[in-house]
């Protein structure tokens, strides 16, 4: 399958499933789409990218943790450090068990990244030789369920939040260093009844193929 064939098929599948889609300008990609999955106001935003020079489709999604939940985590860290370390360890294990690529962004304390959990992303590649509608749709579903697992764990342990996205220190640092951090919009988080997440609206695909750059 060629890159043009892959782009055509992905667009057809998105249209067939009536998913909301936004075109993104990305000089490093043959195609860069943002789609909402599943349908409806509770859907999450996913980046669907075909990087230049690669024979794959990268699917990814970024989740930003609510400011109120971050404050609860900070309190948890101070009151019971061992319990906090166990909790974040369990989050990592849960992500590993989902069999998706993932990355987490922890709050900075000096040179250390001790917490709270500020954002996380999930991603999967789909190579052209295995690209079918079934694989594409199940990839979206798998990433969505991986996100939901962590979102519900955060909500159960640290409350529903205050409806305001919290800071992401890694993005602030990247901006200071002249790098382009992911940007986000309140448009999608405002449509969530629980308000614990905010969606990345940039999602540029990096040349290094670090999964954290897929979202």
Which residues make up each language-model segment?
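Charge-rich, low-complexity N-terminal segments
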Residues: 1-58
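Short, conserved beta-strand/beta-arch hydrophobic-aromatic motifs that form part
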Residues: 46-76
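Glycine-rich, often proline-containing surface loops adjacent to acidic residues and nearby aromatics
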Residues: 55-60, 114-129
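Ampiphathic alpha-helical segments that act as solvent-exposed interaction surfaces
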Residues: 78-97, 128-161
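Short, highly charged C-terminal tails/helix-capping segments
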Residues: 155-211
